[in-house]
């Protein structure tokens, strides 16, 4: 495996693209920050409307980490139901350590239409209406 790390590297074109991005970060990054901020607040506002969900106002990044506490269900059971009935895949917070138990992680890396579509499906689940 050492041989692979010495002989192989990131393709040259990717290295050039990365260098270009770093060199132009003052132009590229602000619109991206604004877009992710809008997506994050969209997800936050949609999560606040769901029963059995507690969410703190986001302060950065493109992840949001709400607490899910549906009576009579574990987080894994809730996530399984969401996936099976809505085809929306969310990550169990416990995957990031024991402190994540009862939480889920949502990445807002898709466009706002997709975020709204996912929440439209989730809001229709009975577990979030009871």
What function would you assign to each model-found segment?
Residues 1-130:
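PLP-dependent class I/II
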């Amino acid at each position: 495996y050492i041989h692979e790390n010495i002989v192989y590297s990131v393709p040259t074109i990717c290295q050039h693209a990365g260098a270009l991005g770093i060199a132009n970060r003052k132009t590229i990054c602000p619109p991206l920050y604004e877009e992710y901020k809008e997506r994050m607040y969209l997800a936050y506002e949609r999560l606040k409307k769901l029963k059995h969900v507690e969410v703190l106002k986001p302060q950065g990044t493109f992840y949001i980490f709400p607490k899910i506490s549906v009576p009579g269900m574990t987080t894994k059971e809730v996530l399984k139901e969401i996936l099976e009935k809505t085809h929306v895949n969310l990550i169990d917070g416990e995957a990031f350590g024991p402190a994540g138990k009862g939480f889920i992680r949502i990445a807002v890396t898709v466009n706002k239409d997709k975020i709204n579509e996912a929440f439209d499906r989730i809001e229709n689940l009975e577990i979030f209406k009871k």
